[in-house]
Amino acid sequence: MKKIQLYLMFILSVTLLSCSSDSDDNNSNQNPSTNGFLYAENGSTTMTSVSSPYASNQYKSIFAVNNSNTIIEINLTSLAVGSYTIDDTTNFFAYLKPGTTGMWTGSAGTVTITANANNKLTGTFSITSGSGISDVNSVSGSFTNIPIQ
């Protein structure tokens, strides 16, 4: 039942947040220690940032939002400091690649939360396997001092 609820929340989030035009601004950055949310696909060393990352304490989720579009959603069992295995049953990772209509869902990987203090969340993620978009094989990145709402 909990998995169904998380899945429904994910679908609702994607539906509500993905209804605006795409921006041509790529916000590329190669400094992973910058506050915010950075990600790259397929092992690229060029990191891309998003404009409005945040974590939801209520849903135990991390959102990477760019110009009102959800790019990455991570649903976990907790936002406590620790390591979480992405397995598509208890911990879920979704990547909505800009410029496409597809969704890549992670089936293996790890999300590590290294700090949760003062309503800010910091950590890393490395999703090594998934499906849904043929040219995406992996997604990795970091989030540093993103606000917890």
Predicted regions: what they are:
Residues 14-42:
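Bacterial Sec-dependent N-terminal signal peptides
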Residues 119-127:
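A short hydrophobic beta-strand element
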